[in-house]
Amino acid sequence: VLDQAVRTIQSYGFIIAPGMIFGFDSDTDTVFEETLDFFVDVGLIGGDPSFLMALSGTPLYRRMEQTGRLIKREEEVTVRKKIETNIRYIQDAEFLKKGFVDFIHRYTEPGFQFTRFKKHMDLIMESDTFIPIDHVGYGSPLEYLKIQIKDVQNRKMFMLHIAYLIRKPSTISAVL
């Protein structure tokens, strides 16, 4: 159901950038792999991975406090790191650390990013509901190009995207 909902939203040209939260009690030992597979299957090109954090005043915070699973700090953390939490997880800490690091390596690998981008573009091209934008939007294409060209890895990824668009000229109309 979720995969079809994501495809439907993206078929109109929207880019979904979900929060990927790991560390739920219901997470299985395949959660990292399943999340990566889901991203490819539905062509998600962005997202924000992190660990579950119990925010003060929420039911989760109270539940973790009542069950002795809340890690209290002297000061409340306002800016957090991706791998920081205040919850004692049920899953093994080493499993979560290793799984998250492996996930990030694969998630940010240029080939994996390109695979997701290609799937996203293919879904848009197959769609009869795509609505192209008729303006530039908030970003400056020239500034974007400068950023891409300065960084070696970004430049390589950018060139892969351009090569894909050149090989499939019909895709260009979907991008523009």
What are these regions (language model features)?
Residues 1-153, 157:
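A structural motif corresponding to the C-terminal lobe/cap of the Radical SAM core domain
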Residues 154-176:
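Long, low-complexity C-terminal extensions of enzymes
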